[in-house]
């Protein structure tokens, strides 16, 4: 009987076990994104301390890699795609987790931004790619110049445009434009449909805007996709 009180005390003060979503997040994500999702995990400050991208602050609700319009929250599928693919050069793929564990990680990520609870994000329309040929590349080159893409990405897509040295992300960190010769490094995917999605949605929090309202004709965007693809080494 004398053991009952100490046992009750132990049960009272012992910390509750993390729920499954938090447990997966703490195991797989907190090292970079931090236990509280602020992008300040133990490894965060060894990752490009003075350059963007840094680990995402998940409490701000601003996500780069989405299929939703600029300024909108991502869908669950967007978050899962990022977990499955990773971000070349910055974030590993988490295909080593089970599908269920990745879904739990998404649940944990969404908890850091309360607006997810009532949000119903809808993806933009992504039409099927047309045939991309020399004619579309030529038109895309004209669009590339007319839209001012070279100011950041450079005349030949090397990421060395005149604006490149001054570019910063929303936190004030310097950010480099993509070198379009190396699609394997594209953060939002290297396939034609991925590039189209990036042009339509933009990369929120960076100088890369959405062109959805600039080019209302999907054909013009596909021309630009074709030209970007032609720059690959």
Label every PLM stretch briefly:
Residues 10-25, 116-145, 184:
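Electrostatic cytochrome c docking/interface patches
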Residues 1-7:
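Sec-dependent signal peptide recognition
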Residues 104-122:
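Short, structured interface segments
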Residues 110-114, 131-141, 210-211, 226-231:
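Short, charged low-complexity intrinsically disordered segments located at boundaries
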Residues 23-52, 115-119, 141-172, 201-210, ...:
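Periplasmic/extracellular electron-transfer cofactor-ligation site
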Residues 35, 105, 109, 128-134, ...:
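Catalytic cores of nucleotide-enabled group-transfer and carboxylate-activating enzymes in metabolic
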Residues 47-95, 102-110, 166-229:
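Extracytoplasmic electron-transfer domains, predominantly the class I c-type cytochrome c fold
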């Amino acid at each position: 009987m004398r053991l009952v009180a100490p046992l009750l005390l132990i049960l009272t003060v012992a910390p509750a076990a993390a729920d499954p979503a938090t447990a997966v997040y703490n195991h797989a994500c907190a090292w970079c994104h931090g236990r509280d999702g602020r992008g300040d995990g133990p490894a965060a400050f060894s990752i490009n301390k003075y350059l963007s991208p840094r680990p995402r602050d998940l409490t701000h609700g601003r996500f780069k890699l989405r299929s939703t319009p600029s300024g909108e929250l991502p869908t669950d599928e967007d978050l899962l795609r990022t977990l499955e693919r990773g971000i070349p050069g910055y974030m590993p793929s988490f295909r080593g987790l089970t599908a269920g564990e990745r879904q739990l990680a998404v649940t944990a990520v969404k908890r850091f931004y309360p607006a997810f609870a009532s949000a119903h994000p809808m993806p933009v329309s992504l039409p099927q790619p047309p045939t991309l040929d020399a004619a579309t590349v030529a038109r895309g080159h004209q669009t590339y110049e007319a839209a001012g893409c070279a100011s950041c990405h450079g005349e030949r897509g090397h990421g060395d445009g005149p604006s490149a040295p001054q570019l910063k992300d929303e936190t004030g960190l310097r950010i480099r434009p993509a070198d379009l010769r190396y699609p394997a490094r594209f953060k939002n995917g290297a396939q034609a449909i991925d590039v189209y999605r990036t042009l339509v949605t933009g990369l929120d929090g960076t100088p890369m805007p959405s062109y959805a309202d600039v080019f209302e004709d999907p054909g013009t965007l596909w021309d630009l996709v074709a030209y970007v693809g032609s720059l690959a080494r």
